[in-house]
UniProtKB/Swiss-Prot annotation:
This is Cytochrome c oxidase subunit 2. NCBIfam families: CoxB (TIGR02866). Cu cation A1 binds at H161, C196, C200, M207. The lineage of its organism: Eukaryota, Metazoa, Chordata, Craniata, Vertebrata. It comes from Cavia aperea (Brazilian guinea pig). The chain crosses the membrane at residues 15-45, 60-87.
Amino acid sequence: MAYPYELGFQDASSPIMEELLHFHDHTLMIVFLISTLVLYLITIMLTTKLTHTSTMDAQEIETIWTILPAIILILIALPSLRILYMMDEINSPSLTVKTMGHQWYWSYEYTDYEELSFDSYMVPTMDLKPGELRLLEVDNRVVLPMEMPVRMLISSEDVLHSWAVPSLGLKTDAIPGRLNQATLMSSRPGLYYGQCSEICGSNHSFMPIVLEMVPLKDFEIWSSSML
């Protein structure tokens, strides 16, 4: 989860988020090198007293600044496409959960079970227990097994919403009349917080998401108690 005054990303808790963090560092380093080079060239141009008034063109330099950006774009595009295909790939999910966005709460349905569904509302500030987080706690958490691929089917009943859990690298639009899907797999147990990430009305800020990732044995106990 996020910490006060945090400047970086949340700790990665899924393979996809780890890949995204590596890609971010890779791209940021390229941007840093380009910015440094441009700043150096500008400084040289502003401080040098040398001029060459008879130069009309420079084929060598033009060739360099045509080929070099192409190489840089390839170095950015290849890992980006790799992660994009990884995010879309779903290999034999062990569980499927359908989530529907409403103004302003989420509803969940475990499609592998006959009667396992519930609504998830934000806990009001006056009802919070010691240690709970304001605007992030819900009355019904989404309990899922850790270290197992889970398919999320995401849609909306009314307006555009977006189902997002940053530490798992998830953000999928919930669109009325359309069913989007995403894959999640947590590498460790814990509570993972998210929020609706699409402005959807006056109470947009009051649509938190809480995933509780537990070992498979504990998930089976929980699912049995909910049926």
